[in-house]
Amino acid sequence: MLAFIRNAFAAPAPRDTHPAIQPPAPVGVALRRWAAALLCMLAGATWAQGQAPDPVVRFGILPLGGAFESRNDWEPLLADLSRAIGRPVSVLSVTSYEALEQAIQRNEVDMAFLSGKMALDAVSQRRMTVVAQVTRHDGLPGYRALLLSRKAPPFNSLQGLLAEPERWRLARGENRSLSGFIVPQLQFFLPNHIAMETRFRSEVVGTHQATALAVANGEADVATNNTADFERFKLQFPVEAARLQTLWESDLIAHAQLVVRRDYPPEFRRKVQTFLTAYARSNGPRGDAERAVLKSLHDFAGFVAADNRSLLPAATLAAQLARQNAMTAQWVNEAARQARLQRIDRSYAEQLAVLRDGGS
Protein backbone atom coordinates (compact mmCIF):
# COMPACT_ATOMS: atom_id res chain seq x y z
CA MET A 1 0.00 0.00 0.00
CA LEU A 2 2.83 2.41 0.77
CA ALA A 3 4.31 1.59 -2.60
CA PHE A 4 1.00 2.51 -4.19
CA ILE A 5 1.00 5.88 -2.43
CA ARG A 6 4.52 6.60 -3.64
CA ASN A 7 3.60 5.66 -7.21
CA ALA A 8 0.48 7.84 -7.20
CA PHE A 9 2.73 10.76 -7.97
CA ALA A 10 5.49 11.25 -10.50
CA ALA A 11 8.98 10.26 -9.45
CA PRO A 12 10.73 13.13 -7.65
CA ALA A 13 12.96 15.26 -9.86
CA PRO A 14 16.59 15.90 -8.90
CA ARG A 15 17.08 18.09 -5.86
CA ASP A 16 17.37 21.83 -6.36
CA THR A 17 20.80 23.31 -5.96
CA HIS A 18 19.14 25.81 -3.60
CA PRO A 19 16.54 23.85 -1.59
CA ALA A 20 13.73 25.86 -0.08
CA ILE A 21 13.28 26.22 3.65
CA GLN A 22 10.21 24.22 4.59
CA PRO A 23 8.08 25.80 7.31
CA PRO A 24 5.62 23.59 9.18
CA ALA A 25 2.39 23.21 7.22
CA PRO A 26 -0.79 24.79 8.65
CA VAL A 27 -3.07 22.33 10.39
CA GLY A 28 -5.70 22.54 7.64
CA VAL A 29 -3.11 21.88 4.96
CA ALA A 30 -1.60 18.98 6.92
CA LEU A 31 -5.02 17.40 7.31
CA ARG A 32 -5.60 17.69 3.59
CA ARG A 33 -2.29 16.01 2.85
CA TRP A 34 -3.24 13.18 5.21
CA ALA A 35 -6.61 12.97 3.47
CA ALA A 36 -4.88 12.78 0.09
CA ALA A 37 -2.88 9.76 1.26
CA LEU A 38 -6.02 8.16 2.71
CA LEU A 39 -7.87 8.73 -0.55
CA CYS A 40 -5.08 6.95 -2.42
CA MET A 41 -5.21 4.00 0.04
CA LEU A 42 -8.97 3.65 -0.32
CA ALA A 43 -8.68 3.82 -4.08
CA GLY A 44 -5.97 1.17 -4.02
CA ALA A 45 -8.12 -1.11 -1.86
CA THR A 46 -11.04 -0.75 -4.29
CA TRP A 47 -8.88 -1.54 -7.31
CA ALA A 48 -7.36 -4.55 -5.52
CA GLN A 49 -10.89 -5.97 -5.27
CA GLY A 50 -11.05 -6.10 -9.05
CA GLN A 51 -13.10 -3.01 -9.87
CA ALA A 52 -11.92 -1.08 -12.95
CA PRO A 53 -10.56 2.31 -11.88
CA ASP A 54 -11.37 5.59 -13.60
CA PRO A 55 -8.40 6.83 -15.64
CA VAL A 56 -5.96 8.88 -13.60
CA VAL A 57 -5.89 12.59 -14.42
CA ARG A 58 -2.25 13.62 -14.74
CA PHE A 59 -1.62 17.18 -13.52
CA GLY A 60 1.52 19.04 -14.60
CA ILE A 61 2.95 21.84 -12.47
CA LEU A 62 4.89 24.81 -13.78
CA PRO A 63 8.23 24.90 -11.91
CA LEU A 64 8.15 27.99 -9.67
CA GLY A 65 10.30 26.83 -6.76
CA GLY A 66 11.78 23.40 -6.18
CA ALA A 67 10.06 20.40 -7.78
CA PHE A 68 9.45 18.67 -4.42
CA GLU A 69 8.21 21.90 -2.85
CA SER A 70 5.83 22.56 -5.75
CA ARG A 71 4.38 19.04 -5.51
CA ASN A 72 3.80 19.38 -1.76
CA ASP A 73 2.12 22.75 -2.26
CA TRP A 74 -0.32 21.42 -4.86
CA GLU A 75 -1.22 18.06 -3.26
CA PRO A 76 -4.00 19.35 -0.92
CA LEU A 77 -5.79 21.20 -3.72
CA LEU A 78 -5.50 18.24 -6.08
CA ALA A 79 -6.85 15.88 -3.41
CA ASP A 80 -9.93 18.11 -3.20
CA LEU A 81 -10.14 18.18 -7.01
CA SER A 82 -9.96 14.37 -7.10
CA ARG A 83 -12.98 14.11 -4.80
CA ALA A 84 -14.90 16.68 -6.84
CA ILE A 85 -14.41 14.99 -10.21
CA GLY A 86 -14.51 11.41 -8.90
CA ARG A 87 -11.16 10.44 -10.39
CA PRO A 88 -7.66 9.98 -9.00
CA VAL A 89 -5.27 12.83 -9.78
CA SER A 90 -1.51 12.29 -10.00
CA VAL A 91 1.13 15.02 -9.97
CA LEU A 92 3.96 15.66 -12.40
CA SER A 93 6.33 18.20 -10.82
CA VAL A 94 9.46 19.00 -12.80
CA THR A 95 12.54 21.19 -12.47
CA SER A 96 12.35 23.01 -15.82
CA TYR A 97 9.94 24.42 -18.38
CA GLU A 98 11.54 22.17 -20.99
CA ALA A 99 10.82 19.01 -18.99
CA LEU A 100 7.16 19.98 -18.62
CA GLU A 101 6.92 20.89 -22.31
CA GLN A 102 8.34 17.49 -23.27
CA ALA A 103 5.86 15.71 -21.00
CA ILE A 104 2.99 17.61 -22.65
CA GLN A 105 4.34 16.69 -26.10
CA ARG A 106 4.44 13.00 -25.08
CA ASN A 107 0.77 13.19 -23.97
CA GLU A 108 1.79 12.55 -20.36
CA VAL A 109 -0.16 15.54 -19.02
CA ASP A 110 -3.96 15.89 -19.00
CA MET A 111 -4.27 19.09 -16.99
CA ALA A 112 -1.67 21.70 -16.09
CA PHE A 113 -0.88 24.97 -14.34
CA LEU A 114 0.91 27.06 -16.97
CA SER A 115 1.65 30.67 -17.77
CA GLY A 116 2.33 32.78 -20.81
CA LYS A 117 4.21 31.10 -23.64
CA MET A 118 3.79 27.58 -22.27
CA ALA A 119 0.02 27.96 -21.94
CA LEU A 120 -0.09 29.52 -25.41
CA ASP A 121 1.81 26.60 -26.95
CA ALA A 122 -0.33 24.05 -25.09
CA VAL A 123 -3.51 25.59 -26.51
CA SER A 124 -2.29 26.32 -30.05
CA GLN A 125 -0.18 23.17 -30.58
CA ARG A 126 -1.10 20.50 -27.99
CA ARG A 127 -4.89 20.33 -28.03
CA MET A 128 -5.44 21.88 -24.61
CA THR A 129 -7.90 24.57 -23.57
CA VAL A 130 -8.02 27.15 -20.77
CA VAL A 131 -10.65 26.60 -18.04
CA ALA A 132 -9.54 28.97 -15.27
CA GLN A 133 -7.10 31.70 -14.33
CA VAL A 134 -5.38 32.49 -11.02
CA THR A 135 -6.35 35.56 -8.96
CA ARG A 136 -4.31 37.21 -6.21
CA HIS A 137 -5.19 39.23 -3.14
CA ASP A 138 -4.01 42.55 -4.60
CA GLY A 139 -6.89 42.40 -7.09
CA LEU A 140 -4.64 43.27 -10.03
CA PRO A 141 -5.22 41.38 -13.30
CA GLY A 142 -1.58 40.36 -13.42
CA TYR A 143 1.92 40.63 -12.01
CA ARG A 144 5.13 42.37 -13.12
CA ALA A 145 8.53 41.13 -14.24
CA LEU A 146 11.45 42.41 -12.15
CA LEU A 147 15.19 42.87 -12.38
CA LEU A 148 16.86 42.28 -9.01
CA SER A 149 20.35 43.18 -7.84
CA ARG A 150 22.17 43.31 -4.54
CA LYS A 151 21.91 46.54 -2.57
CA ALA A 152 25.66 46.61 -1.97
CA PRO A 153 28.00 48.00 -4.64
CA PRO A 154 29.44 47.68 -7.20
CA PHE A 155 26.66 45.98 -9.20
CA ASN A 156 23.68 47.84 -7.81
CA SER A 157 22.51 50.48 -10.30
CA LEU A 158 20.48 50.46 -13.50
CA GLN A 159 22.88 52.97 -15.02
CA GLY A 160 25.79 50.62 -14.37
CA LEU A 161 23.91 47.72 -15.95
CA LEU A 162 23.12 49.70 -19.09
CA ALA A 163 26.63 51.10 -19.36
CA GLU A 164 28.58 47.85 -19.03
CA PRO A 165 26.38 44.73 -19.21
CA GLU A 166 29.41 42.63 -20.17
CA ARG A 167 30.77 43.09 -16.62
CA TRP A 168 27.57 41.69 -15.03
CA ARG A 169 26.64 38.05 -14.41
CA LEU A 170 23.02 37.32 -15.31
CA ALA A 171 20.60 34.86 -13.66
CA ARG A 172 17.45 34.44 -15.74
CA GLY A 173 14.50 32.19 -16.46
CA GLU A 174 14.11 29.80 -19.36
CA ASN A 175 13.24 31.15 -22.80
CA ARG A 176 9.58 30.11 -22.37
CA SER A 177 9.21 32.13 -19.16
CA LEU A 178 7.33 35.41 -19.60
CA SER A 179 8.71 37.20 -16.55
CA GLY A 180 12.00 35.30 -16.53
CA PHE A 181 12.95 36.01 -20.14
CA ILE A 182 10.39 37.21 -22.70
CA VAL A 183 9.16 40.39 -21.02
CA PRO A 184 12.54 41.65 -19.70
CA GLN A 185 14.07 40.99 -23.11
CA LEU A 186 11.22 42.72 -24.96
CA GLN A 187 10.54 45.67 -22.67
CA PHE A 188 13.99 46.44 -21.25
CA PHE A 189 17.02 44.78 -22.79
CA LEU A 190 16.32 44.92 -26.54
CA PRO A 191 15.10 48.56 -26.43
CA ASN A 192 18.48 49.32 -24.82
CA HIS A 193 20.34 47.30 -27.48
CA ILE A 194 21.27 44.48 -25.10
CA ALA A 195 20.69 40.83 -26.01
CA MET A 196 20.33 38.78 -22.82
CA GLU A 197 21.88 35.66 -24.34
CA THR A 198 25.12 37.26 -25.54
CA ARG A 199 25.99 40.51 -23.73
CA PHE A 200 26.62 39.33 -20.18
CA ARG A 201 29.80 38.03 -18.59
CA SER A 202 28.03 34.77 -17.72
CA GLU A 203 24.53 33.48 -17.15
CA VAL A 204 22.64 31.06 -14.92
CA VAL A 205 19.26 29.73 -16.06
CA GLY A 206 16.80 28.51 -13.43
CA THR A 207 13.60 29.05 -11.49
CA HIS A 208 12.70 32.42 -9.96
CA GLN A 209 13.75 31.11 -6.56
CA ALA A 210 17.11 29.95 -7.93
CA THR A 211 17.82 33.23 -9.74
CA ALA A 212 17.05 35.33 -6.66
CA LEU A 213 19.27 33.11 -4.50
CA ALA A 214 22.07 33.35 -7.06
CA VAL A 215 22.16 37.14 -6.76
CA ALA A 216 21.67 37.18 -2.98
CA ASN A 217 24.56 34.73 -2.52
CA GLY A 218 26.92 36.54 -4.90
CA GLU A 219 26.80 33.94 -7.68
CA ALA A 220 25.21 36.45 -10.11
CA ASP A 221 24.80 40.22 -10.23
CA VAL A 222 21.33 40.73 -11.75
CA ALA A 223 18.33 38.39 -11.90
CA THR A 224 15.01 38.32 -13.67
CA ASN A 225 12.08 37.63 -11.37
CA ASN A 226 8.48 38.75 -10.80
CA THR A 227 6.44 40.46 -8.12
CA ALA A 228 4.45 37.37 -7.08
CA ASP A 229 7.43 35.04 -6.73
CA PHE A 230 9.61 37.69 -5.09
CA GLU A 231 6.95 38.23 -2.40
CA ARG A 232 7.02 34.49 -1.72
CA PHE A 233 10.82 34.55 -1.72
CA LYS A 234 10.80 37.25 0.98
CA LEU A 235 8.76 34.95 3.25
CA GLN A 236 10.91 31.87 2.64
CA PHE A 237 14.34 33.55 2.59
CA PRO A 238 14.09 36.78 4.60
CA VAL A 239 17.84 37.06 5.19
CA GLU A 240 18.69 36.67 1.50
CA ALA A 241 15.79 38.90 0.39
CA ALA A 242 17.06 41.72 2.61
CA ARG A 243 20.21 41.87 0.46
CA LEU A 244 18.21 42.48 -2.74
CA GLN A 245 16.63 45.48 -4.42
CA THR A 246 14.45 46.03 -7.49
CA LEU A 247 16.18 47.81 -10.37
CA TRP A 248 13.30 47.69 -12.88
CA GLU A 249 9.74 46.41 -13.25
CA SER A 250 7.62 45.72 -16.32
CA ASP A 251 4.08 46.40 -17.38
CA LEU A 252 1.44 44.02 -16.01
CA ILE A 253 1.57 40.40 -17.21
CA ALA A 254 -1.61 38.31 -17.13
CA HIS A 255 -1.84 35.67 -14.38
CA ALA A 256 -1.24 31.97 -15.05
CA GLN A 257 -3.92 29.66 -16.42
CA LEU A 258 -5.12 26.12 -15.80
CA VAL A 259 -5.51 24.12 -18.99
CA VAL A 260 -7.22 20.80 -19.71
CA ARG A 261 -6.96 18.51 -22.73
CA ARG A 262 -9.69 19.07 -25.29
CA ASP A 263 -10.02 15.28 -25.52
CA TYR A 264 -12.03 15.42 -22.30
CA PRO A 265 -15.78 15.96 -22.83
CA PRO A 266 -17.19 19.46 -22.22
CA GLU A 267 -19.07 18.31 -19.11
CA PHE A 268 -15.81 17.13 -17.51
CA ARG A 269 -14.09 20.45 -18.26
CA ARG A 270 -17.08 22.32 -16.83
CA LYS A 271 -16.89 20.21 -13.66
CA VAL A 272 -13.22 21.14 -13.25
CA GLN A 273 -14.00 24.81 -13.88
CA THR A 274 -16.88 24.80 -11.40
CA PHE A 275 -14.68 23.24 -8.72
CA LEU A 276 -11.89 25.78 -9.23
CA THR A 277 -14.07 28.89 -9.33
CA ALA A 278 -15.95 27.83 -6.16
CA TYR A 279 -12.80 26.88 -4.26
CA ALA A 280 -12.17 28.91 -1.07
CA ARG A 281 -15.28 31.04 -1.69
CA SER A 282 -17.54 29.64 1.02
CA ASN A 283 -17.80 30.70 4.66
CA GLY A 284 -17.17 28.44 7.64
CA PRO A 285 -14.58 25.75 8.39
CA ARG A 286 -14.51 24.32 4.86
CA GLY A 287 -13.85 27.70 3.28
CA ASP A 288 -11.22 28.47 5.92
CA ALA A 289 -9.43 25.19 5.22
CA GLU A 290 -9.48 25.82 1.46
CA ARG A 291 -8.16 29.35 1.93
CA ALA A 292 -5.30 27.90 4.00
CA VAL A 293 -4.51 25.59 1.08
CA LEU A 294 -4.37 28.53 -1.34
CA LYS A 295 -2.23 30.56 1.04
CA SER A 296 0.39 27.82 1.09
CA LEU A 297 0.01 27.54 -2.70
CA HIS A 298 1.82 30.75 -3.71
CA ASP A 299 -0.74 32.80 -1.74
CA PHE A 300 -3.44 32.53 -4.41
CA ALA A 301 -6.75 34.28 -3.72
CA GLY A 302 -8.67 31.83 -5.90
CA PHE A 303 -9.58 31.15 -9.52
CA VAL A 304 -11.87 32.79 -12.05
CA ALA A 305 -13.46 31.18 -15.10
CA ALA A 306 -11.43 31.82 -18.24
CA ASP A 307 -11.08 30.58 -21.80
CA ASN A 308 -8.46 30.74 -24.52
CA ARG A 309 -9.02 34.47 -25.02
CA SER A 310 -7.12 35.05 -21.77
CA LEU A 311 -3.97 34.13 -23.73
CA LEU A 312 -4.30 36.97 -26.26
CA PRO A 313 -1.83 39.20 -24.34
CA ALA A 314 0.72 36.36 -24.20
CA ALA A 315 0.38 35.80 -27.95
CA THR A 316 1.01 39.48 -28.60
CA LEU A 317 4.12 39.51 -26.38
CA ALA A 318 5.54 36.39 -28.06
CA ALA A 319 4.96 37.83 -31.54
CA GLN A 320 6.52 41.17 -30.57
CA LEU A 321 9.62 39.43 -29.24
CA ALA A 322 9.92 37.28 -32.36
CA ARG A 323 9.71 40.39 -34.56
CA GLN A 324 12.28 42.23 -32.43
CA ASN A 325 14.67 39.29 -32.71
CA ALA A 326 14.15 39.11 -36.47
CA MET A 327 14.82 42.83 -36.84
CA THR A 328 18.08 42.75 -34.86
CA ALA A 329 19.44 39.42 -36.18
CA GLN A 330 22.02 39.11 -38.97
CA TRP A 331 20.59 37.87 -42.29
CA VAL A 332 22.17 36.97 -45.62
CA ASN A 333 19.98 39.64 -47.24
CA GLU A 334 16.93 41.78 -46.57
CA ALA A 335 14.67 39.35 -48.44
CA ALA A 336 15.46 36.65 -45.87
CA ARG A 337 14.58 39.03 -43.03
CA GLN A 338 11.28 39.96 -44.65
CA ALA A 339 10.44 36.29 -45.24
CA ARG A 340 11.00 35.61 -41.53
CA LEU A 341 8.80 38.57 -40.55
CA GLN A 342 6.04 37.33 -42.84
CA ARG A 343 6.16 33.86 -41.23
CA ILE A 344 5.91 35.46 -37.79
CA ASP A 345 2.91 37.52 -38.86
CA ARG A 346 1.15 34.49 -40.38
CA SER A 347 1.73 32.41 -37.26
CA TYR A 348 0.47 35.25 -35.06
CA ALA A 349 -2.69 35.63 -37.16
CA GLU A 350 -3.36 31.89 -36.91
CA GLN A 351 -2.91 32.01 -33.13
CA LEU A 352 -5.29 34.94 -32.80
CA ALA A 353 -7.95 33.07 -34.77
CA VAL A 354 -7.65 30.05 -32.45
CA LEU A 355 -7.65 32.12 -29.26
CA ARG A 356 -10.51 34.43 -30.22
CA ASP A 357 -12.69 31.36 -30.74
CA GLY A 358 -12.42 30.93 -26.96
CA GLY A 359 -12.19 27.15 -26.99
CA SER A 360 -14.95 24.65 -26.30
Model-identified regions with their sequence ranges:
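Short helices/loops that flank or line small-molecule/ion binding pockets
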Residues: 98-112, 125, 143, 208-223
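A ligand-binding cleft/hinge motif common to bilobed small-molecule-binding domains
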Residues: 116-126, 189-190, 216-217, 221-242
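Bilobed "Venus flytrap"/periplasmic-binding protein-like clamshell domains
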Residues: 54, 58-82, 94, 140-213
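An extracytoplasmic/periplasmic, membrane-proximal ligand-sensing/linker region
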Residues: 65-66, 72, 76, 271-360
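Boundary at the C-terminal end of the N-terminal hydrophobic targeting segment
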Residues: 46-50
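Periplasmic-binding protein-like
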Residues: 58-63, 136-146, 238-273, 291-307
